[in-house]
Amino acid sequence: MDIKKIKVLFLIPNLAHGGAEKVLVNLANNINKEKFDVTIQTLFDVGVNKKYVNSSVKYIGGCRFMFRGNTNIMKLFSPERLYSYLIKDKYDIIVSYLEGPTARIVSGCTNPNTKLVSWIHIEQHNEKVASGSFKNYNEALKCYSKFDKTICVSRTVKEDFQSIFDLKNPVEVLYNTNESNLIVKKAKDKIVDVTFDKDVYNLVSVAKIVPSKGYDRLMKIHKKLLDDGIKNHVYILGIGEEQEKYEKYLRDNHLEDTFTFLGFRDN
């Protein structure tokens, strides 16, 4: 006798080079497919992590390119309207895997038999930031209140979220999923195109090159250390919208030889 699988949808803006996107792919790939029918749907069909989605996971891509102002455009439509336009199938569980736009969309589900989950990955600190993808704070509170459960990736994220939104439904902590065996395996790979100078301090950072990561401050600290006679070399693993601006700063301050962008890498 065939057991009916639980249909789960994960909605996320895209599968770009961020940590949440990678973690979602890890999670979806490793969910028990004998019990769950898993789908990942993106608002934008872009991102380096698309290629890592297993064939056992259904993938639904959205718009083929990202464009500025998309969040503001979505605010013109109600959550219910967006949901009915974007989500075409019926699911037992729908997960908004990032705070913001996808949470607003998923909250528009009107099927009482569908369980809704909101997954929060970052500390948002205040009402203004937390409601940036909504029309206002009241709409954000109304939308998040419709979720049966909210998952936060750490205790501090949970505390931050609850300081902004006072929800009746459960808010729980669930740490990110990692493919530990794959990490151990890749740790044995030899990296041949990067050589560390043993006579200087080598600093490696892994993150998107976006304002929130603070790389502008890191470059200034790097320069000050060099000016103070402390030799060091910084390596950045990642890509992002701020890279060209940061590279200009490095050129203007003659730091190109001691601050290296390595780009996105599988390992």
Predicted feature residues:
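N-terminal strand-loop element at the rim of the active site
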Residues: 5-6, 10-18, 22-26, 30-73, ...
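Active-site proximal beta-strand in glycosyltransferases
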Residues: 8, 93, 107-127
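A conserved mid-protein helix/loop that constitutes part of the nucleotide-sugar donor-binding site
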Residues: 18-26, 201-224, 230, 241-247
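Nucleotide-sugar donor phosphate/pyrophosphate-binding loop at the beta->alpha transition
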Residues: 74-80, 115, 124-146
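Short His-centered aromatic/hydrophobic patch
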Residues: 96-102, 120
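Short beta-strand->alpha-helix junction loop in the catalytic core
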Residues: 124, 156-157, 174-189, 208, ...
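Nucleotide-activated donor-binding/catalytic signature segment of Leloir-type glycosyltransferases, i.e.
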Residues: 247-265
